[in-house]
UniProtKB/Swiss-Prot annotation:
Complex and partners: Forms a cylinder of 14 subunits composed of two heptameric rings stacked back-to-back. Interacts with the co-chaperonin GroES.
Function according to Swiss-Prot or TrEMBL: Together with its co-chaperonin GroES, plays an essential role in assisting protein folding. The GroEL-GroES system forms a nano-cage that allows encapsulation of the non-native substrate proteins and provides a physical environment optimized to promote and accelerate protein folding.
Entry keyword Magnesium: no
Entry GO MF terms: ATP binding; ATP-dependent protein folding chaperone; isomerase activity; unfolded protein binding
Official protein name in the record: Chaperonin GroEL
InterPro entries, sorted: Chaperonin_Cpn60_CS, Cpn60/GroEL, Cpn60/GroEL/TCP-1, GroEL-like_apical_dom_sf, GROEL-like_equatorial_sf, TCP-1-like_intermed_sf
EC number, UniProt record: 5.6.1.7
Provenance organism: Streptococcus gordonii
Membership in a protein family: Belongs to the chaperonin (HSP60) family.
Top-level taxonomy: Bacteria, Bacillati, Bacillota, Bacilli, Lactobacillales
Pfam families in the record: Cpn60_TCP1
Binding site for ATP: T29, L30, G31, P32, D86, G87, T88, T89, T90, G413, N476, A477, A478, D492
Methyltransferase found in the keyword field: no
Length: 540
């Protein structure tokens, strides 16, 4: 395919047009009075959203050179979303500001490489200053504030803070669609896996169709149990203790299952059998997790263990187990806390080294089940369009909250960027590097300007007053008042703020140092086929 090539100013200006188109579309959503953007979908109703990364991903421009500029900014939003889960609009605004100021200087004859070095030094100083002013987040109220600011809903803030309190920082919090119109929180404490009882005759509550086992023994094996004789010595030992039994096995079939059911119905023995969760290597890992949580041993050939030789000491224990037709929940396993902590540490290191998003997600689920539990926020809304928009907001809020717990918080509303201006201005640089520093100084003001503009205020006036205000004071764009940002609950996670700045500077620097752009030439339209004269009939 033939290529179209542009050089120097032509190349950069074409890319900048793309940057501006995308950034101008995204930045209208910034702040408490930001507007929505409507995205056409191939199927179904349009998506109405104020989520920066969702909007950025949808934008495709006809001009190849402009589209490359737009895609680079979209990459900033995506990268910020991957790292911090929020702050994508802020990152887009910062990118546009750095590119706009940088292009002016490059066009005037400044060296782009020197400018890039200055930008990198200024950003490193700004990030360091942001981290120094960070306030740790630990209590429920602070978590609720972070989530409320991100989602623009105090109710959502309460749900997320309650969920994090219940399941801990390592717990899994999932977002699902509710069948009703109300948004609600459902928390499952303990370890849950998606396997239910093998026979409905094993239930203890026939009205709710669940089996509740109090203080049970737990047999964990990756073998199939077909012959009751294999586990008969073990069953006789448990029978003497008068305690119930949960069997987690590859399967229970043959004559073993009806024998267990018959003893359950007769009241001889309270037993529930479920299939082991997962498949392949993941199943082995999950069975080992259950064993460590309950203080038991996995009966497996890998360890040279056989069912007929298993003793009561190899069984796990828990304070309660609840089994329904689809899932099993183990509450308060009797495992050694030190062994559980070691297992958690191993899974955390596996998460860090995992390259696949799917693997990371599954490891995160295992971590949550070992360390806390699972919380589900069920989102309700009047229409499907509203439901989609609300789900995106809650996902952003959840990510922002996790980021806040991880690295702390700073003043929100773009105030944190302005608060580090003095630290960046104090950086002693010369020549083009000083120009790079000055570009960052101007860009750091841009989020506040845009938030003020979206709320109907003059950005320059707000910036001037903010620079002369005492530390911690900022502009509440929602009310038009000047307040202490932290006390007013207008806060941003440090991780979100620094990621937005670092990613924006990285991609903007690449655009400024671009000297040639290569794009595919558009395919010429194929000519329409000539009409066959024989088909013209009596037209002549």
């Amino acid at each position: 395919m033939a290529k179209d090539i542009k050089f120097s100013a032509d190349a950069r200006s074409a890319m900048v047009r793309g940057v501006d188109i995308l950034a101008d579309t995204v930045k209208v959503t910034l702040g408490p009075k930001g507007r929505n953007v409507v995205l056409e979908k191939s199927f179904g109703s349009p998506l109405i959203t104020n989520d920066g990364v969702t909007i950025a991903k949808e934008i495709e421009l006809e001009d190849h050179f402009e589209n490359m500029g737009a895609k680079l900014v979209s990459e900033v939003a995506s990268k910020t979303n991957d790292i911090a889960g929020d702050g994508t609009t802020t990152a887009t605004v910062l990118t546009q500001a750095i590119v706009r100021e940088g292009i002016k200087n490059v066009t005037a004859g400044a060296n782009p490489i020197g400018i890039r070095r200055g930008i990198e030094a200024a950003v490193a100083t700004a990030v360091s200053a942001l981290k120094e002013t960070a306030i740790p987040v630990s209590n429920k109220e602070a978590i609720a504030q972070v989530a409320a600011v991100s989602s623009r809903s105090e109710k959502v803030g309460e749900y997320i803070s309650e969920a994090m309190e219940k399941v801990g920082n390592d717990g899994v919090i999932t977002i699902e669609e509710s069948k009703g119109m109300e948004t609600e929180l459902d928390v499952v404490e303990g370890m849950q896996f998606d396997r239910g009882y093998l026979s409905q005759y094993m239930v203890t509550d026939s009205e709710k169709m669940v089996a509740d086992l109090d203080n049970p023994y737990i047999l964990i094996t990756d073998k199939k149990i077909s012959n009751i004789q294999e586990i008969l010595p073990l069953l006789e030992s448990i029978l003497k203790t008068n305690r119930p039994l949960l069997i987690i096995a590859d399967d229970v079939d043959g004559e073993a299952l009806p024998t267990l059911v018959l003893n359950k119905i007769r009241g001889t023995f309270n037993v529930v059998a479920v299939k082991a969760p997962g498949f392949g290597d993941r199943r082995k890992a999950m069975l080992e997790d259950i064993a460590i949580l309950t203080g038991g041993t996995v009966i497996t050939e890998d360890l040279g263990l056989d069912l007929k030789d298993a003793t009561i000491e190899a069984l796990g224990q828990a304070s309660k187990v609840t089994v329904d037709k689809d899932s099993t929940v183990i509450v308060e396993g009797s495992g050694n806390p030190e062994a559980i902590a070691n297992r958690v540490a191993v899974i955390k290191s596996q998460i860090e080294s995992a390259t696949s998003e799917f693997d990371k997600e599954k490891l995160q689920e295992r971590l949550a089940k070992l360390s806390g539990g699972v919380a589900v926020i069920k989102v309700g809304a009047a229409t499907e369009t509203e439901l989609k928009e609300m789900k995106l907001r809650i996902e952003d809020a959840l990510n922002a909250t996790r980021a806040a717990v991880e690295e702390g918080i700073v003043s929100g509303g773009g105030t944190a960027f302005v608060s580090v201006l003095d630290a960046v201005a104090g950086l002693e640089l010369t020549g083009d590097e000083a120009t790079g520093r000055n570009i960052v100084l101007r860009a750091l003001e841009e989020p506040v300007r845009q938030i003020a503009l979206n709320a109907g205020f003059e950005g320059s006036i707000v910036i001037d007053r903010l620079k002369n205000s005492e530390a911690g004071t900022g502009f509440n764009a929602a009310t038009g008042e000047w307040v202490n940002m932290i006390e007013a609950g207008i806060i941003d996670p440090v991780k979100v703020t620094r990621s937005a700045l670092q990613n924006a500077a990285s991609v903007a620097s690449l655009i400024l140092t671009t000297e040639a752009v290569v794009a595919n030439q558009p395919e010429p339209a194929s000519p329409a086929p000539a009409m066959d004269p024989s088909m013209m009939g009596g037209m002549m």
